[in-house]
Amino acid sequence: MAMDARWQIIAYLIASVLFRLASERLDPFIKVHISRHPAWMNFGSPFLRFVYHIGFPYLALLLGALPARYLGLVGLEQLYGAPELSTVSGMVERMRITIALLLRSWLPQLGPWASLTILMAGLLTATWTLYRYARRSTGGNPPFSSMPGSAGDVTAFSTMVYAAVHWSFYRGGIWWLSDDLYLGVAGGAALIFVEWGLCAWLAGRPLQQLTSERTLIEAGLLIATAAIFYYVPNLWLLIPVHWLLARLCRYLMPAPLDLADMDI
């Protein structure tokens, strides 16, 4: 791998983290002045979320800094120059062939993907069931907090797509740098945890945010999806699993409104 390619990926990862930190830092200022600029809630804030979660991964992919397979976009690279696509002209027919080629490339992964999905769902169910009983028996309530820049319901599909794509971007970037999938998965998770910690520190309440049930659910989803990505590095299949696991966690942990404001 050329050194300049390594530095490109490093630059994208650092820029993404700095963008998130800058957004967190600016959030209190924005909230104070939100009444003067109501259009911010309808355009500005969603635009920043899109740039952070989707913009950086897409730019790295578009400019060739990060190959598609490292993002988990299995089958995408095979579409370029595919003879089946070069012989058809109709848009509908090209779309049908494209979907067929993608599905064909996923077939070997469907078995492990289904097994890991069931396993992770079982582990999360057991973990959160035990947690609920432990909390009920102690009579205590862990701290809740609302994270600046919250992004809607935890079960919202758009929120899950954002998280799945961006987490895969961090995993894929470090996978590309290290040329080791295990290091990519572990390093990507570590980078996300560091980013969360820095955001909590900038907010001035690190312990409260990092021990909230919202953050615990985020961490559980991160670990579960990282394990699935290690064995089945396919973002197409990971996105619906991410959403289903998030709905499962939300069902198992009915809690105050901080869970309805998760930004993952």
Annotate each predicted stretch with a short phrase.
Residues L13, V17, T129, P142-I264:
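Transmembrane helix-loop-helix hairpins at the membrane interface
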Residues L21-F43, L130-G149, L202-S212:
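Cytoplasmic membrane-interface regions of multi-pass membrane proteins
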Residues M1-T125, T215:
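Alpha-helical transmembrane segments in multi-pass membrane proteins
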